[in-house]
Swiss-Prot record:
Cofactor: pyruvate
Source organism of this protein record: Fervidobacterium nodosum (strain ATCC 35602 / DSM 5306 / Rt17-B1)
Broad class of the protein's primary localization: cytoplasm
EC number: 4.1.1.11
Any single GO BP term: alanine biosynthetic process
Phylogenetic classification of the source organism: Bacteria, Thermotogati, Thermotogota, Thermotogae, Thermotogales
Subunit details: Heterooctamer of four alpha and four beta subunits.
Pathway: Cofactor biosynthesis; (R)-pantothenate biosynthesis; beta-alanine from L-aspartate: step 1/1
Catalytic activity: L-aspartate + H(+) = beta-alanine + CO2
Protein name in UniProt: Aspartate 1-decarboxylase
Modification after translation, per record: Is synthesized initially as an inactive proenzyme, which is activated by self-cleavage at a specific serine bond to produce a beta-subunit with a hydroxyl group at its C-terminus and an alpha-subunit with a pyruvoyl group at its N-terminus.
Protein residues bound to substrate: 57, 73-75
Length: 116
């Protein structure tokens, strides 16, 4: 049986920008995408720690090393600049192929504190 399991998580990232007049998406620093294994255009679940909002969007890249986490379009109405968010990507796995998720624990400046 195939099951939907957590593939990757960027924990406690800080929202650096929001742009309502945009097509939609979450922009994530390319370095963080590479470290987490989250792909461009991948569907992600976002949880805002400050206000409890949870929503689904897709990923676009932000410049490598910029430390940008930007929410765009309708999703930008659900967060504020400075909010702490959890970004989660999931995959469909068989019991035998699933190992464990890649988890990035973030500092407040969106540098990586720890990788699990």
């Amino acid at each position: 049986m195939m099951e939907i399991m957590l593939k990757a998580k960027i924990h406690m990232a800080t929202v650096t920008e929001k742009e309502i007049e945009y097509e939609g998406s979450i922009g994530i620093d390319e370095e963080l995408l590479e470290l987490s294994g989250i792909k461009i255009n991948e569907m992600v679940l976002i949880s805002d720690v400050n206000n409890g909002n949870r929503f689904i969007t897709y990923v676009i890249p932000e410049p490598r090393g910029s430390r940008k986490i930007s929410l765009n379009g309708a999703a930008a109405r659900l967060v504020e600049k400075g909010d702490k968010i959890i970004i989660m990507a999931f995959g469909l796995y068989s019991k035998d192929e699933y190992k464990s998720p890649k988890i990035l624990i973030m500092n407040s400046d969106n540098t990586v504190k720890e990788i699990r």
